[in-house]
Amino acid sequence: YTGELGRKVVGMLDTSRSRLHRATGSVYAASLPYASRIISVWSGHRPEDRDRIDSVAFARGIPAVGVELLPTSLECGPAVVPGRTACYRCYQRRLHQHRERTASLMRAGAELPEGFAGGEVAIAAGFIGQALADMNRGDAGTSLGGEVRVFDLVQGGLHKYETVAVDRCERCGSRYDRRRHPTAAIAHLV
């Protein structure tokens, strides 16, 4: 987590059995402690950090989700479960494909000062709880997974949608499963 929003959201969650990592700058793979799940919380849009976290989640085979406070919305997701859902990179590609105006607003939001009320903190904590429940669901049923929850801060609307993987994605596509296996690099030696 980072910033005041991250600190307050983490304060609302049961973190007694968690490892907390306060990011003071960019997030890199080596700086992330091993955990059973990775949850990121911050103000602004930080796609490079989210993508690095997602790549660590896929490399370690653990679920990940992030919450971002943007100028007009509070977004949680996608809830990524390696081997079951689309990755963050696919989410970014779909976002740019369908909502270029929103993507430009997100880029602008990274430079704005952090500002939020207690309601946004509670909604973010609730979104994380729902994302964790999604991750723990053993059977995805008819769900595509990669759920994204968005609370519109202007109109007060709540939206939920799922992320569809991009064809031939090297991170989450089933075509590349064998290359992503932890021992793939040394498999020919055994």
What positions do the PLM features span?
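Adenine nucleotide-associated cytosolic modules
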Residues: 1-190
